[in-house]
């Protein structure tokens, strides 16, 4: 069933991967899919709960530290563990690693918003029980993580004991061999409060340096004819014990409420207790109904239906669901590279948000997209300070990786040097304006962001023979660092500069008083705006006459080509097996670079150049980055390479489900998940957002019968259905509009389906 991810075998070798796959979250709180009872000692677990943006600052140690290197980096923290539930069947501890597992089923219900384990277990002494665990992280009450357990004795069992714990002694996972995972600073929280207030158990943790606080307040409830209860404080936690006698079924519920300083202010424990008291009247079934209502609304617009391939249908729904679970829904947070499913990349926000994830929400849930932009706006002052540190008198340089605005990248060649992130962020603000026409947002936030990022480019580049050039930067391809005139960077900077000038003119015509106030606040002059226009108009975009392609940068095509065909499979990803300088000296791409620019800014080049460039760069791309395959799928669709488009899409759709990059244990690949949706909507369906409106050119993979999706545009919901030999469009909400279908204008009247054969 494509609405349900099922694991029907208890495979010990897949435990860590399944912890990520079966994680739960709501954008504020995330919990990995651990077993409540834990594992046997021979198996490791990354047991985790995370609050989006809740972090500590840790010192960066350099062998040689130079000016401008960050002193510290931010790190998402594994917070208080409230998952613990141990079950004793008489005197035998329930464990899937002892006795006999008679049947096992584990499900993630993506339409209903909960996960479950259904187990028939025979103890070493022969006692049989059925255990049904359900858990959810509430979309309606963002602070709530709830667990429900039903225990059914299948034999004459005298007593069952349930031991529930909350543990404040937690630490982060480290891996010294993988640069994508933290290598130190595992413990960054100390327990600052342990107490009980009536029936509520309370633990508070405080971060070492930021002094941010997090509280978990827990209540438990049992339905059993005969039971005894006791609780006690243990070291760094609280333990509750229920001893149930008789052979009747037992129902146990555990509600865990998390609050933190960033959202709840200084009185985090009082806030957690208050929320707990409001939950008393809510049964677990009530919470499930709230989940279903929320998800019905989400899937109504966000679902992508594929007729013809159940595995890929499961893949796209799983990826969209995990994006929803991880994306921040308040301006205090964004979406981390691994979301809230794990600790890879230390909970940092990258350009992944703007280029791969933001478009999904922009076209389906624009309010969520707006919050992502508001988070970037909230760190604008930090970006201004970072620009000054890098020697720029004006402008905003956004951090390559961050949580609350400070640069957290210690390796500047593949970090700070990726100046393109500022243009990527500007690009997302422009796309938001085109899709929503939110004039107030433009005046209050977007214009300032565009002006400050344009200032960065004007100060970074210089003119040679009338052409505007940008030196010593790194593009998306991290196997090629510190180059002059990276095509992607220059093309995105050009877009940024020209749109900043255009928005300045637009505000001058439509709301001159607002513009004047902004100019005065920024000390912005007319000469600066003219300089943006000139720099954009005269931006140098590398082009090779002999190959008739856009050169990735000034020196890339002069390098020796890496022999990918003869590189042993065990040497991938290359970054784990070759020194960076070895990679930098070759023509080899970690991911799409020039090809990505041609996707985002296809109007800047003719189709022949785009095709030639794709053919050239695809041959030397390793796809070591999970951000690569989706872009190659999208552009293969545009160029008519149907099989390539489909094959690359396959890679994106099930990358985590199949653990193809071998690091899903550290968390799910959020950008790739966004890329799955992009591969269908921007790839197969050919969607582009033009200034004139939506433009589509739908194609259908040979193996499919049809696909259907919805998109939002300027207050409308538009349904797109592509079948064999035809495509239909319908405005299901909002006013009618004109769209482009294969470059031809088509008017869509509200409620009337238009079918084109």
Question: For the regions a protein language model found, what residue spans apply to each?
Answer:
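Carbohydrate-binding/catalytic loop surfaces
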Residues: 337-348, 392-415, 467-486, 554-556, ...
């Amino acid at each position: 069933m494509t609405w349900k991810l099922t694991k029907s075998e208890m495979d010990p070798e897949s435990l860590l991967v399944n912890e990520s796959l079966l994680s739960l979250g709501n954008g504020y709180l995330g919990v990995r899919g651990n077993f409540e009872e834990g594992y046997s000692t021979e198996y490791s677990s990354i047991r985790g709960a995370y609050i989006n943006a809740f972090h500590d600052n840790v010192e960066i140690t350099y062998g040689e530290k130079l000016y401008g290197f960050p002193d510290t980096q931010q790190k998402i923290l594994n917070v208080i563990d409230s998952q613990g539930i141990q079950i004793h069947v008489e005197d035998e501890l329930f464990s899937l690693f002892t006795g006999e597992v008679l049947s096992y089923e584990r499900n993630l219900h993506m339409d209903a918003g909960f996960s479950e384990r259904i187990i028939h277990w025979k103890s070493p002494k022969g006692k049989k029980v059925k255990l049904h665990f359900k858990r959810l992280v509430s979309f309606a009450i963002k602070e709530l993580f709830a667990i429900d357990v039903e225990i059914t004795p299948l034999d004459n069992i005298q007593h069952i004991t349930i031991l529930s714990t909350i543990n404040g002694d937690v630490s982060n996972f480290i891996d010294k061999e993988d640069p994508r995972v933290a290598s130190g600073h595992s413990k960054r929280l100390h327990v600052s409060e342990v107490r009980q207030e009536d029936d509520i158990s309370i633990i508070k943790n405080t971060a070492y340096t930021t002094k941010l606080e997090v509280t978990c307040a827990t209540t438990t409830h049992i339905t059993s004819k005969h039971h005894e209860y006791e609780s006690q404080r243990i070291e760094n936690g609280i333990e509750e014990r229920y001893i149930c006698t008789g052979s009747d079924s037992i129902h146990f519920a555990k509600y865990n409420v998390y609050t933190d300083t960033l959202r709840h202010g200084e009185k985090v424990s009082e806030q957690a207790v208050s929320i707990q008291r409001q939950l008393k009247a809510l049964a677990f079934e009530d919470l499930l109904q709230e989940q279903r209502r929320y998800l019905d609304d989400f899937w109504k617009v966000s679902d992508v239906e594929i007729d013809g391939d159940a595995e890929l249908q499961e893949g796209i729904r799983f990826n969209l669901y995990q994006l929803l679970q991880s994306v921040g829904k308040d301006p205090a947070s964004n979406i981390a590279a691994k979301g809230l499913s794990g600790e890879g990349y230390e909970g940092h926000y990258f350009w992944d948000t703007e280029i791969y994830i933001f478009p999904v929400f922009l076209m389906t849930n624009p309010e969520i997209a707006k919050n992502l932009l508001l988070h970037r706006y909230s760190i604008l002052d930090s970006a201004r300070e970072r620009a000054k540190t890098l020697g720029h008198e004006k402008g905003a340089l956004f951090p390559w990786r961050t949580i609350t605005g400070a640069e957290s990248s210690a390796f500047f060649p593949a970090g700070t040097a990726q100046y393109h992130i500022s243009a990527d962020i500007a690009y997302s603000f422009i796309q938001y304006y085109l899709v929503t026409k939110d004039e107030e947002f433009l005046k209050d936030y977007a214009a300032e962001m565009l002006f400050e990022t344009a200032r960065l480019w004007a100060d970074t580049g210089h003119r040679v023979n009338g052409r505007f050039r940008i030196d010593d930067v790194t593009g998306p391809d991290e196997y090629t660092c510190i180059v002059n005139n990276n095509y992607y960077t220059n093309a995105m900077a050009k877009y940024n500069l020209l749109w900043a000038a255009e928005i300045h003119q637009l505000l001058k015509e439509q709301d001159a008083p607002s513009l004047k106030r902004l100019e005065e606040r920024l000390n912005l002059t007319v000469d600066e705006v003219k300089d943006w226009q000139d720099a954009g108009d005269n931006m140098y975009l590398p082009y090779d006459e002999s190959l008739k392609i856009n050169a990735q940068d000034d020196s890339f095509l002069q390098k020796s080509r890496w022999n990918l065909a003869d590189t042993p499979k065990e040497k991938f990803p290359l970054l784990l097996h070759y020194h960076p300088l070895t990679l930098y000296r070759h023509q080899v791409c970690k991911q799409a670079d020039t090809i990505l620019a041609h996707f985002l800014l296809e109007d800047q080049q003719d189709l022949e150049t785009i095709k030639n460039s794709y053919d050239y760069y695809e041959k030397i791309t390793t796809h070591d980055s999970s951000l690569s395959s989706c872009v190659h799928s999208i552009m293969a669709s545009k160029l008519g390479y149907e099989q390539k488009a489909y094959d690359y899409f396959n890679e994106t759709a099930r990358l985590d489900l199949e653990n193809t990059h071998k690091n899903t244990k550290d968390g799910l690949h959020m950008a790739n998940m966004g890329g799955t949706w992009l591969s269908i909507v921007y790839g197969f369906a050919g969607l582009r957002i033009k200034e004139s409106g939506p433009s589509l050119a739908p194609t259908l993979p040979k193996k499919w019968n049809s696909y259907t999706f919805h998109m939002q545009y300027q207050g409308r919901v538009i349904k797109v259905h592509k079948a064999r030999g035809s495509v239909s469009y319908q405005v299901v909400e909002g006013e009618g509009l004109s769209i482009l279908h294969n470059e031809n204008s088509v008017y869509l009247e509200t409620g009337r389906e238009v079918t084109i054969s």
